[in-house]
Amino acid sequence: MSDSQPCSTPSTRGKSDSGYIPGDDTWTQWRNIFAILTGQMTDEGKEQFRIARDIRNEAADCKRCEDQRDYLLQYSPIIRFLSDNIRQLRGDLSSHNIYCRRCTSRKAGGFDPEYGILLCANEMKDQGHLEDTMAHEMVHAYDHLRFKVDWTDNLRHAACTEIRASSLSGECRWAREFFRRGQWKFTQQHQECVRRRAILSVRARPGCKDEAHAEKVVNEVWDSCFRDTRPFDEIYR
């Protein structure tokens, strides 16, 4: 969980070559937004603007994340189902080990067998996005308990659990891909989304040489892992 951060205060230095102007007042924020819209801010400046915004909104983002997390744990069918199945494997995921934090890397969340689930509050778009992210990480938790996943050295294990998490969580359903990610295909959309996300995840692991290596590993386990819908009877959504 090293990429989650406590509260801090953005710099108050003057405008840099990136086009970003530090400051929390409304006028400065509008100047920055205008610079982005008119192409006067570099990618570096946009990243500085994003980080400052996330720091400024951290308390509100985390509070909203925690409220939605607690609601989903109580009322979401998919989250409750996964929680029950994890509990049957003598695991426990609840508000005490599902953490809402500001993350410094661009990701939605993560699972650690020792600590639990991290939800990146500053990356959550809405409650549906949070539900998909929780379900994704809970599938990882289920796999860790059910299949004894080797997270460190076995890329095939990593590829398999990523295939299952992307397929079963709902994050690759057609509406999510169509409206959120601009993927316009109607045929084989679900499979292509799952494969794409699994390759990206494997590619980011230290033991992976390159994208071709990641694709090879995903292809090796694809058939068996994509068909395995446990603990569901079928792909839920």
Swiss-Prot record:
Membrane topology qualifier: Peripheral membrane protein
Molecular function (Gene Ontology), one example: metalloendopeptidase activity
Predominant localisation class: mitochondrion
Keywords: Hydrolase, Membrane, Metal-binding, Metalloprotease, Mitochondrion, Mitochondrion inner membrane, Protease
InterPro entries for the chain: Peptidase_M76_ATP23
Location in the cell: Mitochondrion inner membrane
E.C. number: 3.4.24.-
Source species, domain of life: Eukaryota
Residues binding a divalent metal cation, per UniProt: H136, H140
UniProt GO cellular component terms: mitochondrial inner membrane
Polar residues bias (residue ranges): 1-13
Any GO BP annotation: mitochondrial proton-transporting ATP synthase complex assembly
UniProt cross-references to Pfam families, sorted A to Z: Peptidase_M76
Family (UniProt): Belongs to the peptidase M76 family.
Name of protein: Mitochondrial inner membrane protease atp23
Gene name tied to this protein: atp23
